[in-house]
């Protein structure tokens, strides 16, 4: 499942994004809804193995010309105020990860208490885990 989603995400000919949320279980209980600073205090980093894809979609056309920061803020608003009918997760929250593929450049971003923290290497780790 994860490999199929990643393959489609990376091969997309248009801009797309993924919303990842922590799986339920004891291995995620201490990191769920924790800030990136708190993870660092615990000596942890976001682990792709602990996440599941809860949404995959084309990026809205009006995102064209926006910076990643602006696009991420728009997604935050969307997934908190007007979630798509086919979304099967909780509102976008601290500890979630948004993965953007814009103009052929992909990057992963941790939802932090304020803003987003880019996660270099996260996507590569996802590919290895899939």
Which residues does each predicted region cover?
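A generic structural signal for short, non-catalytic loop/turn and secondary-structure boundary residues
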Residues: 10-13, 46, 93, 104
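Short, compact, well-ordered microdomains
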Residues: 88-126
